């Protein structure tokens, strides 16, 4: 869900276009820093935004909205987590799982 931000696209809009074709999704979140050239870390998008990875549900990506779009399109598959944050990866994933559960995603 968050990868669309890497090319300055609206994640919810992109998910709405692709949802009917989805057979697997992964959730990823970013803290977006608008047009900060001197930002010391993260990724620089083609539009000069800086993206810093964070736990799913802790950033600026519309994760809940994307999940709702997927559900309304009939997606009932797995949601994997992709964590690229600066903190411990186990803790980052644990927090992402908690947040996804609070958004209505079930675990097995």
Which residue ranges define each predicted feature?
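Acidic/histidine-rich catalytic cores of soluble enzymes
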Residues: 1-60
């Amino acid at each position: 869900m968050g990868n669309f931000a890497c090319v300055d696209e609206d994640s919810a809009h992109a998910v709405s276009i692709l949802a009917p074709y989805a057979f697997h999704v992964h959730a990823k979140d970013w803290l977006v820093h608008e047009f900060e050239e001197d930002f010391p870390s993260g990724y620089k998008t083609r539009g000069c935004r800086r993206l810093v990875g964070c736990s799913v549900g802790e950033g600026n990506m519309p994760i809940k909205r994307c999940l709702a779009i997927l559900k309304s399109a009939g997606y009932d598959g797995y949601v994997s987590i992709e964590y690229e944050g600066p903190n411990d990866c186990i803790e980052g994933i644990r927090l992402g799982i908690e947040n996804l559960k609070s958004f209505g995603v079930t675990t097995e």
